Every structure is written in structure tokens, then in C-alpha cells.
Amino acid sequence: MALPSETVDTRFTRLVGCRLPFQLAALGGVGTTELAAAVSAGGGLGMVPYGVEPPAAELGPAGIGFLIPYVPPARVITEAASRVRVVEFFQGDPDENLVAAGHDGGALVSWQVGSVDEGRAAAAAGCDLVVAQGVEAGGHVRGTTPLDQLMPAMLAAVSVPVLAAGGIGRAERAAALIAAGADAVRVGTRFLACPECNTHTAYAEALLAAGADDTVITGDFDDGGHWPGAARVLGGSLIRARRSGNRSTMPPTRAAEHPLAMACYAGMSVAHLTRIQPAAEVLRDLASQL
């Protein structure tokens, strides 16, 4: 059993400098400094979406996630990279100029991908880490391949550390992926009901009541055509959004007026989200079988 004071030795923990092979998903729209801080202090890699203040460096390694449809100028990426250990990109083809902007700030650069070809492109662009996202993931889904098929192919295709992402909600699942060669796992859905997360109460309650079969992949939430692509959400939110005509990609925050008619992102691991827990406790649970 991995205790918070122990280090699990993987290429990820050695490179990033954290104790546990876990990365918090940036959770755009609801991710907070407090959530990332709890994960960093607990031994993982805490992440915030671009625009949210990263946690203090003394708490542990942290990172900033950038979405390609809304990526800022290179100089802004470089400045952000100077404040964190990792910058990560998602929802776009790997771009060596963006990778260079992250490196210029002194950060490691990660790219979340949905296919082996995209993983190879990320490594060729100079990325230090590749996140292999299985189709089980919540939120925007880049590929169509289940994680158990994608991971062995990705590990064989690239030489940089590979993180597994998508549908990871149990300690046993995390341990199995690490044992099978993953350098770390990336988790998002399990943290959505944490008190440190900016999730609307109604959204959190819907997550707690949901099972694995209650998620669907849809292209409806495309931000009015600005961000096309598939996303995994709670099925009930899709029905309500279609009735209201809402197409916003923004997940329901505590300030949302009609939270359950918005993009209620959830991965297939939602079935393992059964109660509200502090982020540090979630991380300990996930690491308990390592």
C-alpha cells in the first residue's frame, strides 16, 4: 500500500518529481487552485486550467492545461510555464512551436492524445510526456479506442513516459495500469465531487447518482461551432440541453443558473464516485493498491 510519504518509482515520478504516479485532470471550467494544491500536497501532479492560479510551488509539482481552440500566444505560454513543472496541451494536433514555448519557460511539456499516430507526433514535436486518452474518458474525447487497447500500442510506439487516462476510478484499476506499463494515470471524474472543486451542487448530485451506463458521447456541446468534437457527458444533461438549445462546452459551475442543462462531463468511472470526499482522501484511495 502506498502511503502519502512513500514514493512509487516510475519514469513519471522521477521526471516530474512527485511521490505518486497520479495526475489530476485540469478540469477546465471547474478546476481550482485549491483542488490542484490538495493533489500536489498529497504527492501527485496537481493541474489547473489556463486562467486559474496554480498552487504554490512548495506544495509540490503542479501544471497548467491549455486547450488548443483557446490557446494564448506563445509568450503567454512561456510565462505560464515558468511558474509550474508541467504544461499540457489537448484538442489539437501536436505543434512543435507550442512545445518550444513551454520548454522556453522551463517546464516539461505533455500532450494528451487519442491515437498512436497522435502520440508519435507528440513525441516527435518534443513532448516530454504523452497522455493516452481512452474513449472511456469524460469531457472532450480525442479518440475512439478503449484504453486497454490504446496503452500497449502507445507504450510500444513512443519512448517518453506515457500516462493512462479515461475511466479510471478505482485503486485496483490504477494499480493494474501501472503494473501493465503505464508510467502514471490521469484522473478527472473522481475529483468532480470534491469540496475543493468548483462543481455546482446539482451537477455533483447527478454524478453521485450516476452509473457507468449513464454517460453518452455527443457532438452537441460544440460551443456554437467554435469547438467541434465528441464529448462524454451524463445522458440526462444532453436531453435537457437539447430541449433548451444550449450548446455551451462550459461545465456547470457553482454559479450556473441551469446546471443540469449544460455539459455535465463525466467519464465511465462515474459509477465509482459515490460520495463527497476531500481531494487528498480521493488520492489516497486511488493510490492504496500500489
Write out the residue ranges for each language-model feature.
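Conserved acidic functional residues
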Residues: Q112, G166-G167
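Conserved active-site-proximal phosphate/metal-binding subdomains
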Residues: A2, A137-H140, T144-L163, G169-L290
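Active-site entrance/lid segments in N-terminal catalytic domains of soluble metabolic enzymes
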Residues: M1-P161
